[in-house]
From Swiss-Prot:
Name of the coding gene: glyA
A GO MF term: glycine hydroxymethyltransferase activity
InterPro entries assigned: PyrdxlP-dep_Trfase, PyrdxlP-dep_Trfase_major, PyrdxlP-dep_Trfase_small, Ser_HO-MeTrfase, Ser_HO-MeTrfase-like, Ser_HO-MeTrfase_PLP_BS, SHMT-like_dom
Residue numbers binding (6S)-5,6,7,8-tetrahydrofolate: 118, 122-124, 242, 350-352
Functional summary from the UniProt entry: Catalyzes the reversible interconversion of serine and glycine with tetrahydrofolate (THF) serving as the one-carbon carrier. This reaction serves as the major source of one-carbon groups required for the biosynthesis of purines, thymidylate, methionine, and other important biomolecules. Also exhibits THF-independent aldolase activity toward beta-hydroxyamino acids, producing glycine and aldehydes, via a retro-aldol mechanism.
Name of the protein: Serine hydroxymethyltransferase
Gene source species: Helicobacter pylori (strain Shi470)
A GO term from the CC aspect: cytosol
Family matches, as PANTHER family: SERINE HYDROXYMETHYLTRANSFERASE
Length: 416
């Protein structure tokens, strides 16, 4: 496959190879990123990309779907087994598509959504004013206490006041566990449905390293990459037959046309990997590595949102620093450490500048890095931030970390 691409489009081939080198030589620590399995990429690059299959298994609008019916059915069964639930829709193209389909299925225009505030760790699709959800529905938000933990009492008071039709519990930048049971109690109190968005922690959930959203959530959405290490894509789960039927209609024909059968096959492959005992060990490593990193940073007197972490990510707090999240992002990037600037609770800077950075452990754990490496990384991050304008230091650290990264190759060959 690489041979044909090199011959037919050398520009793209060389850029892919350049990105392969970057991923190998840099330390990828963006919390939403991971290295997928080679077998997943093989399925993604298969002849399945040629097949249209509007509809669902055994209920297609196109002919020639006998094989892809088997593939999608297998993906569904594996998802149900993995998450221990009765119904699964594997067609959503992304996590955002999954969330929008849930709203389309269960809400009417201008119904009310209650989700986590964006600056406190929520996601755009949880009701942010700039997103589709903030325009088509009435959106309200809950936040965190001064200690950085979700303020469940505030969430209850807001829910009692606005009476939302759906409450979203989930995040894109929250370093602690979600208490699904508490959220269900709040939802029941006001007669709301509860959507658990576990896009970030799904891999931890299925490995028993994070609380499970079932039986508390009426419906659960997720991505299939991030901590699951599968292909880029979305997933919707439920134990309610009526909700499942509405979800299916909301995906097709409600918000999508033909499903991406190569992606669905890749999801099935990923789910099989997630069901292996080795994946539990991986999820444990993700959490333990993040604890090592948090400890290393705190020992150097760096402030973390909520005082630490209980999952795969942490947030560094620069509210009292002369430099911003953007400054830290650039400096660490120059040193070969890829993170992202992130708004944090009590934010005083713009979303394009921010007062924090988000750091994740999933990708480097997938490479096999452990406590020793994460302690080194924590110390290097501290060195860079403590002398943030020292470009020569950044370049020196980059070479040191490049040598360390070479001991943990991402893949054995550059292109699949």
């Amino acid at each position: 496959m690489a041979y044909f691409l090199e011959q037919t489009d050398s520009e793209i081939f060389e850029l892919i190879f350049e990105e392969y080198k970057r991923q190998n030589e840099h330390l990828e620590m963006i919390a939403s990123e991971n290295y997928t399995f080679a077998s997943v990429m093989e399925a993604m690059g298969s002849v399945l990309t040629n097949k249209y299959a509007e509809g669902y298994p055994n209920k297609r609008y196109y002919g020639g779907c006998e094989v892809v019916d088997k593939i999608e059915s297998l993906a569904i069964e594996r998802a149900k087994k993995l998450f221990n639930c009765q119904f699964a829709n594997v067609q959503a193209h992304s996590g955002s598509q999954a969330n929008n389909a849930v709203y389309h299925a269960l809400l009417k225009p201008y119904d009310k959504i209650l989700g986590m505030d964006l600056s406190c760790g929520g996601h755009l699709t949880h009701g942010a004013k700039v997103s589709l959800t903030g325009k088509h529905y009435q959106s309200f938000s809950y936040g965190v206490n001064l200690d950085g933990y979700i303020d469940y009492e505030e969430a209850l008071k807001i829910a009692q006041s606005v009476k939302p039709e759906i409450i979203v519990c989930g995040f894109s930048a929250y370093p602690r566990e979600i208490d699904f049971k508490k959220f269900r109690e709040i939802a029941d109190e006001v007669g709301a449905l509860l959507l658990g968005d576990i896009a970030h922690v799904a891999g931890l959930v299925v490995a028993g390293e994070h609380a499970h959203p079932f039986p508390h959530c009426h419906v659960v959405s997720s991505t299939t990459h991030k901590t699951l290490r599968g292909p880029r894509g979305g997933l919707i789960l439920t134990n309610d037959e009526e909700i499942a039927a509405k979800i299916d209609k909301a995906i097709f024909p409600g918000t999508q046309g033909g499903p991406l059968m190569h992606a669905i096959a890749a999801k099935a492959v990923g789910f099989k990997e997630n069901l292996k005992p080795e994946f539990k060990a991986y999820a444990q490593l993700v959490k333990s590595n993040m604890q090592v990193l948090a400890k290393a940073l705190q020992e150097k007197n760096h402030k973390l949102v909520s005082g630490g972490t209980s999952n795969h990510l942490l947030l560094m707090d620069f509210l009292d620093k002369p430099y911003s999240g953007k400054d830290a992002d650039i400096a660490l990037g120059n040193a070969g450490i890829t993170v992202n600037k992130n708004t944090i609770p009590g934010e005083t800077r713009s979303p394009f500048v921010t007062s924090g950075i988000r750091i994740g452990s999933a990708a480097l754990s997938a490479r096999g890095m452990g406590a020793k490496e994460f302690e080194i990384i924590g110390n290097k991050i501290s060195d860079i931030l403590n002398d943030i304008n020292n470009v020569s230091l950044q370049l020196h650290v980059k070479e040191e970390l490049k040598a360390m990264a070479s001991q943990f190759p991402v893949y054995q060959q550059p292109i699949f």
